[in-house]
Amino acid sequence: MQRSRAGADEAALLLAGLALRELEPGCGSPGRGRRGPRPGPGDEAAPALGRRGKGSGGPEAGADGLSRGERGPRRAAVPELSAQPAGSPRASLAGSDGGGGGGSARSSGISLGYDQRHGSPRSGRSDPRPGPGPPSVGSARSSVSSLGSRGSAGAYADFLPPGACPAPARSPEPAGPAPFPLPALPLPPGREGGPSAAERRLEALTRELERALEARTARDYFGICIKCGLGIYGAQQACQAMGSLYHTDCFTCDSCGRRLRGKAFYNVGEKVYCQEDFLYSGFQQTADKCSVCGHLIMEMILQALGKSYHPGCFRCSVCNECLDGVPFTVDVENNIYCVRDYHTVFAPKCASCARPILPAQGCETTIRVVSMDRDYHVACYHCEDCGLQLSGEEGRRCYPLAGHLLCRRCHLRRLQPGPLPSPTVHVTEL
């Protein structure tokens, strides 16, 4: 293919040089051009390059260094049509009817040449069969210039003599079939009908993902970091210490910058330190003392009631149970009790059974009955004679007499004259 194209280029340059040489001043027949060699039987038809035309001829330097001679008085013959694509940037002048009358053979020579910067849909190929003539110049790149070139009649319409108008352009002959059929590429669908189904599906998935991310963000929100003031999202980023929330990266040692999440730390002067920095930097001199044993608290510290304790020293004063993380209470003398022992010691005593009135199992509220300025269990509030359970209902109300709990019937019986009934004896198991 490259050899065929090079041969076509050489033939085109040779024909152009011959045409320009005939137009030089002093030529024997200035109005006639030499006929180029005929193409081979299998080659494509090449445009006639040795044309003659009218017009004033002046010396003009061309691309090949030749000067144009005076044009002959006779009109050049109409060149043969070239079977070249009309849309090529270097299409042949054979597609114009006025190529021989108003054109210039000089401009034809200028337009010849092979330009490697532009591609051509068809390339000049030599017939593998031997022929008498040179290779055919069938490439659109090696043909003469198109209508917009310097040699066309339309390009020199302003320089034509008065009354002369260029002949109308003639449509080129239909080109033959391309040697290499081009595949038909499917064009993308138009946008007149809106987005495609795939685009709508992608948009729906994007909205669904955004909603899922918003729901997850709202679910994993813990609060505001007290140090940086930003929101805390995710359990791995949250840290709670000293009654406040921190980011894991914000709750660090003020000395070495180590993260303190899940580690022992010490709060000294509103600054937190890890255990190593606290022990080996002299801060232990300002460490708190335990309110129970009086020793320095060098490890975990438990603060309650405005005092500091070792976790092992914070115990109930009755049962000696460790109260670290367990509900507790204190008396007026700041003695520490668990809830059970506190009610045992300080709960009111029942006037009937003399036992403390304690809350029920799993309940923190104490229920008691107060009658005649005395406290009773609910189960102990009954008639002392017949054992009827007393309450505020009609027929079960209490009618006390001489400090005894009586129902109405037993109360009236005791008011009748006669010997008083023997008091009821209640046996209580200890």
Curated annotation (Swiss-Prot):
Q: Which Gene3D superfamilies does the entry link to?
A: Cysteine Rich Protein
- Do the record's keywords include Metal-binding? yes
Domain called LIM zinc-binding: residue spans: 223-284, 288-348, 349-417
Q: Which protein is depicted? A: Wilms tumor protein 1-interacting protein
Which Pfam families is this protein grouped with? LIM
Q: Which domain of life is it from?
A: Eukaryota
**Oligomeric state and partners?**
Forms homodimers. Interacts with CD2AP and WT1. Interacts (via LIM domains) with SNAI1 (via SNAG domain), SNAI2/SLUG (via SNAG domain) and SCRT1 (via SNAG domain). Interacts with EIF4E, AGO1, AGO2, DCP2, DDX6, LATS1, LATS2, SAV1, EGLN2/PHD1 and EGLN3/PHD3. Interacts (via LIM domains) with isoform 1 and isoform 3 of VHL. Interacts with ROR2. Following treatment with bacterial lipopolysaccharide (LPS), forms a complex with MAPK8IP3 and dynein intermediate chain. Interacts with PRICKLE3.
List all Pro residues biased stretches.
Answer: 164-189
The lineage is: Eukaryota, Metazoa, Chordata, Craniata, Vertebrata
